[in-house]
A protein has these predicted regions:
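Condensing-enzyme catalytic core of the thiolase-fold
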Residues: 135-495
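Acyl-group transfer acyltransferase/transacylase scaffold of fatty acid/polyketide systems
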Residues: 1-156, 446-453, 486-487
Length: 495
């Protein structure tokens, strides 16, 4: 077995519950400090560790810590029940109670509110003093407090990172269970016919996997659901789990001020399901785009706004930007922003191929002389966003910070489908200005980089004008993961 680092809990990569905590794991967590042998005051009982009463007593600090750690790791915390029982246990005998905050907690306001309803409460909070001396939180910034993603060669973000780190090329011939390529493939297009000159894409391993029962959806309805919506529901739920949020009553965010912004580019399943399954009572909510974000809100019992978006390859960027604007305007307090692409119908391949944007030879050859178009790809991802000051106050796990976001359109391009370097240059400058950053502060740029001759040239030209020249010793690396995982269209600018 590989030796475990001293500062890493065994098998635990974040706060989580498990029904199986071994004695060896508990020994590791509790440790071997001599303080564990110290005796507690006789008769001391700690309410809330072993259940709803305080009938269990502990003789030493070690016994108490082991019991507390076991419950923390293996039992779900029902805070509403715990606080209600605590309040009842205090009864009318305690007119005044003192509360000591041992660390940052998003539940402090709820606990204090319940206790203050029936008695006087004094709060000892050293954190307020220490935090007031720290750095001020940057106004206008958005925190990413949770995220998820899966795509070609990856079932989660760790596997996704491994695809990038190991330089994998995920393109393959279109699987037979997606579509019959031979029915539409040709070496040269004919006028009026739906044909395609490409045979490749980058695909998820299990596009049909979906636990319908977990989401309270019948098998009949699940079959009619757009796979894009199924995967977004799973991705968003996973992102919320990583952020520590659920549909429970102890949230630090008002469910009426939680929004969903979801982007998709095509309606492949509408064609597939209508042809194979006809119309059903569940067809409407199965394929109508509005039900993509709506299902998540319904699942989580949120009553904030939901938005179904389509701005082609900029879909996920639009979702994130609009979510940021809603947060900064304080229209909402938390937002889920994401997008999904699942390739399941040949017709979207045919008209993209006829438009001349798809590679006939394989994956995206970003910034290469032999670039001949992009390779389509599956992907599903979601971000959980909050105002930075709220994320700090709620002790959220801040994964990254969005200093600024912006969107525009290439209205002066040579055609509606081509890029405009001038528009991109203007947008880059706007983002830097709003973020109060100098171009030399930027240390890496993830490019759009689809592998088209016109698009790649325009993008690199805009980046060069804004971020060059650079001082000696401060180079600017650029990259594009589309060379690994293809172009996932609506999702592409968030992965």
């Amino acid at each position: 077995m590989k030796k475990r680092p001293n500062n890493e809990l065994p098998g635990i990569r974040g706060l989580q519950h498990t029904l199986d905590v071994s004695a060896a794991d508990m020994d590791y967590v509790v440790g071997n400090s001599t303080l564990l042998e110290m005796q507690l005051r006789p008769g001391l009982k700690v309410w809330g560790i072993t259940g709803d009463d305080a009938n269990t007593s502990y003789s030493s600090w070690g016994d108490l810590l082991r019991a507390a750690a076991l419950q923390t790791l293996s039992q779900r915390l029902d805070l509403v029940k715990i606080v209600s029982n605590l309040n009842a246990c205090l009864g009318t005998s305690y007119k005044h109670v003192g509360v000591k905050l041992m660390g940052p907690s998003g539940h402090a306001a709820y606990i204090l509110g319940v206790l203050k309803a029936t008695r006087q409460v004094s709060v000892d909070d050293d954190l307020q003093t220490s935090s007031s001396k720290g750095e001020s939180v940057r106004e206008g910034a958005i925190a990413i407090v949770g995220m998820s993603g899966k795509g070609p060669g990856s079932e989660d973000l760790d596997e996704f990172w491994n695809v990038i780190a190991t330089g994998q090329d995920c393109h393959q011939e279109i699987p037979a269970d997606r579509m019959d390529v031979d029915e539409y493939f040709c070496t040269k297009h004919s006028p009026g016919k739906c044909t395609m000159t490409c045979r490749h894409g980058c695909f998820m391993k299990h596009p049909g996997h979906f636990d319908a029962k977990f989401f309270h959806i019948s098998p009949r309805e699940a079959l009619l659901m757009e796979p894009v919506h199924r995967h977004f529901l799973m991705s968003a739920y996973e992102a919320l789990e990583t952020a520590g949020y659920s549909a429970g009553q102890t949230r630090t965010t008002d469910p009426n001020k939680t929004a969903v912004f979801f982007a998709q580019s095509f309606d492949d399943w509408l064609k597939v399901s209508h042809h194979a399954l006809g119309c059903d009572a569940y067809t409407l909510q199965g394929v109508q785009r509005a039900f993509g974000p709506g299902r998540l809100a319904f699942q989580m019992k949120w009553e904030g706004p939901t938005y179904a978006l389509d701005s082609a390859c900029a879909g996920s960027t639009s979702a994130i930007h609009l979510a940021c604007m809603s947060l900064l305007s304080k229209d909402v307090d938390m937002a889920v922003a994401g997008a999904t692409t699942i390739l399941s119908d040949p017709h979207s391949f045919t008209f993209l191929s006829k438009a001349g944007v798809l590679s006939e030879t394989g994956n995206c050859k970003t910034y290469r002389d032999d670039a001949d178009g992009y390779c389509r790809a599956d992907f599903s991802g979601a971000l959980i966003l909050k105002r930075l000051e709220d994320a700090v106050a709620h002790n959220d796990n801040i994964l990254a910070v969005i200093a600024s976001s912006a969107r525009n359109h290439s209205g002066n391009a040579t055609s509606i489908t081509t890029s405009d370097a001038n528009a991109q240059e203007s947008l880059f400058k706007k983002v830097l200005r709003n973020a109060r950053l100098d171009p030399n502060d930027v240390s890496y740029i993830e490019m759009h980089g689809t592998g088209t001759q016109v698009g790649d040239k325009a993008e690199m030209g805009a980046v060069s004008k804004v971020f060059l020249p650079r001082p000696a010793g401060n180079p600017l690396p650029v990259g594009a993961i589309k060379a690994n995982i293809g172009h996932s269209e609506a999702v592409s600018l968030s992965n």
